[in-house]
Regions:
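N-terminal secretory signal peptides that target proteins for export/translocation
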Residues: 1-12
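Generic alpha-helical structural signal
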Residues: 8, 25-27, 35
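Bacterial N-terminal signal peptides
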Residues: 18-28
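N-terminal cationic amphipathic segment used for targeting or macromolecule association
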Residues: 26-31, 158, 369
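Acidic, metal/ion-coordinating pockets
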Residues: 32-282
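Short sequence/structural segments immediately N-terminal
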Residues: 34, 43-49, 168-170, 263-427
Length: 427
């Protein structure tokens, strides 16, 4: 008979016990497996934090990608949904952002996207047909009314509702986006598969939300943000029936948690969240396209330069020596350098608050109009042209209003006129 050492028997016993424990844990995991929900949305073109202030440096698609990737590695049954309203305000640069956002969403892979008013403003022709846009209260539109997902052995139906009040529809045509009604809910119920769990992506009024709540038909209702102030985030949507969870505005946070949870948790996308590497090429390409957009407008703007009303701070020095010295020692006199350091000295959305008269026949580029670089006298006092012709003609001054043109929202969350004004006060 072959003899085994005590240590050998001990090792076998340990492996046996570990095997039993692993089987038990695996069984427990299978029994308790359930969908892990992640919800985003309401980006409104804020593809990346501007970086103007550390305390408001939140959000961005690259940080979202990192967090989502980490959760996917931890939860095999992850269900990712997006509440839409992601596109920026219409503009030439906005179109570049739109393209980046949709390319990023392809990599982030949401199961469903609810198109919001911002998407509607650009027109359906701009919506990428390879993305899972969803609008359940639409008729005769090329988008599904319901998206089904099998997760953790459960069938989940994702429905989407956007109130017609937020969408432009030609008054001479029959409406193709319908308001909530008993007939609409009954139509949805007739399309539903028995035994399914149902989730509603919603953007509308509290009265409309109550209609859906009172139907008792949905397991969860998730609300797109109606809040415009990112410095005062509101994550609760009040209704007469019960409060609902509302996504943070401007993409600054995500909702996440198991589907059985009464309340999902908020994960804020703060400065300590790294950028997701797979999105880096998209942002590099976007920066190059924005630069080309900027350069393409220079020739046209140069032709208008002879009509400029701005003269630059150097023209003020002779008569306003002390004021000029005060300006030179302030951060305003180096405003453009803060953009140059991060490669944003060609980005129109940034330049408007870092130079004089951008897109107003003023600053063109640091090479063509260096005299109008940085925040100068004319940013606050207005054009000095008439004052130079007649020194007794003083430009109007509303210091507070001049400040809040740029020191606003997440760009300057700590702004307080009473503490900021003394830093640049001059006579």
């Amino acid at each position: 008979m072959k003899m085994h050492s005590v240590s050998s028997l001990s090792r076998r016993g340990t492996r046996f016990l570990l095997g039993l424990l692993g089987t038990f844990l695996l069984g427990a995991t299978l029994v308790h497996a359930e969908p892990y929900l992640v919800v985003s949305g309401d980006l409104r073109g804020e593809i990346k934090p501007c970086g103007c202030a550390e305390e408001s440096d939140m959000g961005g698609l690259q940080r979202r990608g990192t967090v989502l990737s980490n959760w996917r590695s931890e939860h095999s049954d992850l269900l990712y949904l997006d509440l839409g309203n992601n596109f920026p305000e219409p503009s030439a640069q906005g179109k570049l952002k739109l393209d980046l956002i949709q390319q990023a969403l392809k990599l982030l892979k949401p199961a469903a996207i609810l198109p919001g008013p911002h998407e509607w403003n650009y027109g359906q022709a701009t919506w990428d047909t390879s993305l899972p846009y969803l609008l359940s209260n639409a008729i005769d539109l090329p988008w599904p009314q319901v998206i089904s997902q099998n997760v953790s052995g459960e069938r989940w139906e994702i429905w989407g509702y956007v109130t017609p009040n937020l969408l432009y529809q030609n008054e001479n045509d029959l409406p193709n986006v319908l308001p909530v009604s008993n007939a609409l809910i009954q139509q949805w119920q007739s399309q539903s598969q028995p035994g399914s769990k149902r989730m509603l992506l919603f953007r509308g009024t509290s009265v409309e939300a109550d209609r859906f709540l009172q139907s008792g038909w949905f397991d969860r209702i998730l609300v797109g943000s109606s809040n415009d102030d990112e410095l005062n985030q509101v994550t609760t949507f009040a209704t007469a029936t019960q409060p609902l969870q509302m996504i943070p505005t401007k993409g600054q946070g995500l909702y996440h948690g198991f589907s059985s949870s009464d309340q999902l948790d908020v994960r804020w996308l703060r400065l300590d969240t790294a950028d997701w590497e797979p999105l880096t090429p998209l942002f590099t390409n976007y920066d190059q396209e924005v630069k080309q957009l900027f350069l393409s407008g220079l020739k046209r703007m140069q032709q208008l330069q002879q009509e400029t009303r701005f003269v630059g701070a150097a023209a003020c020095t002779t008569c306003h020596t002390q004021a000029h010295q005060s300006w030179e020692s302030s951060r305003h006199s180096h405003a453009l350098a803060t953009l140059t350091r991060v490669g944003k000295d060609f980005d129109p959305e940034c330049l408007q608050c870092h130079v004089v008269g951008f897109q107003k026949k003023g600053f063109l580029s640091n090479q063509l109009t260096p005299q109008l670089a940085n925040v100068q006298c004319e940013n606050c006092h207005g054009s000095a042209q008439e004052h130079l012709k007649n020194p007794l003609n003083h430009p109007p001054l509303d210091a507070r209003q001049a400040c809040v043109n740029c020191h606003v929202g997440s760009h300057s969350p700590s702004f307080d006129f009473s503490t900021y004004w003394p830093k640049i006060q001059h006579k």
